[in-house]
Amino acid sequence: ASSLSQLRRRRQVVLSYFEDMHVEVSEASHDTPYLFQSLLYGQPLENKTRTWTHYVTPRGFAELMPFTNTASGNHIGWHIGRVDNWTGRWESIEKAQEASKNMVLFNATVGNKEGIAGKLTKNPHILITGATGEGKSFLAELIFLLTSLQDVKCLYVDPKRSIRKHFEAIAHHPDFEKRFPLLAKHIKQINFVTLDSKVKSNHGALDPIVMLDKDDAVSVSKNMLNYLIFSNKRIKVTMKQMTAISRAINKVVAQRQAGETVGLKHVLQELTNNPDSTIFEVGDYLTSIVENSILELAFSDGNVEGLSYDKRVTVLEVADLSLPDKDNQQDVTPEDKEINSTALMFALGAFCTRFGELNRYEDTIEFFDEAWVLMKSAEGRAVIQSMRRVGRFFNNVLCLITQSVHDAEGDDDTTGFGTLFAFREDNELPDILEHVGLTDNEENLEWIKNMISGQCLYKDVYGNLNMISIYNIFDSIDPLLKPMKATVSSNLEN
């Protein structure tokens, strides 16, 4: 308009026009442009904004969730899933993922780092628990693959032998090589090691006297031999025999430190060469159970290289490993193969410990699957404890994958775990709540009962606790994490 009076007339024409059409038009005031900024959540009210005050019911205000935090995970990291804020039960993990916009990022190497604002723990270790089929191996392998792309030295101990065959088949598939050439190259560069006692060149690869320093070699050797003896309840061992075993181990380890080519087999020879018949008997018994068994992987004459610590990414598996059932009763005598396999796990644990403490200035991480096998015995718990104590000082992360939240407990457990992933285990729901620091009440029990396969409780290094839906967003990694192929029957089921 050319004048104020003309502007007012035109304004009235517009209002009358819309009024005739029964359309309500609101007139703006001079401060309307600032309305949006003034009504932003948390914006302080000024004198000019008092007429814009919004009234809200307590229920409506509570839905805004003031002073609460639903963040989970690290600020920078790899996507491993999304937070699930619903207390109900989802039909599928995909629907839970689609319903959330709150991403969970994870970086396994920052747990022990200094100067990170808000971090409540400097404990770098990770514990993944849950029943079979709930998703703990999926999560562990996802974290392993993503972390292997960083400048981190990685070791995955796979007693189930589930990774190598599947990874290599996928990486060498022509279609995968064409679509994802860089990842295929990365998988092919992983140092896959399968220790098979039937292959003579593997004998002694896990010999503790060969691969460990003096104190650890003595400790692990004693643990292995003691376990082999005491697991057979038909054998009565005297103090004289136990003393002879300890002296033989100390002698052979001292010879190794002096530069002689000796190994754990020489300990057995020391016992069988003893003129005392009772000491000869225990040496002869140990020699008999080692011969032509999986234990040959840990017994050598010292003329072996042992496992390499130099490869950046290693997957270590042991052929013919027969692990005992976790639900076996303590008074049930395990089979010989189970006893031998468990004794060998002590050597595997010692290798992991040594792997993590070689270079304190290098980030390292070990994934130890089926860790409950070690936690069933006092000797095994000591091995796990030594692996955990490497921790912060050596920039080492230990990730234990096991079935029960009780598997990592111990009377002398002071090192704990800084990061917890607890998948559903129906027989331990109250224990899971206690494990993550929640009250055991009906509301919380109902909440975790609604967890589906692929969901878990996640407690991060900042102390945040949420239910999250584990989900992989990388098309290239997806085939590596899904070893079970769909069938006609499974497709028809949907």
Give the location of each predicted region.
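Basic- and hydrophobic-enriched, low-structure N-terminal and domain-boundary segments
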Residues: 1-124, 473-475, 492
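Anion (oxyanion) recognition and catalysis
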Residues: 19, 148, 392
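Short, glycine/acidic-rich hinge or "gate" loops at secondary-structure transitions
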Residues: 24-36, 164-166, 260-263, 361-364, ...
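P-loop NTPase motor domains
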Residues: 58-104, 110, 161, 169-173, ...
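Conserved P-loop NTPase motor cores
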Residues: 110-134, 138-144, 155-164, 170-171, ...
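Conserved SF1/SF2 helicase motif Ia
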Residues: 150-152
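Flexible glycine/proline-rich, aromatic-decorated loop/lid segments
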Residues: 177-202
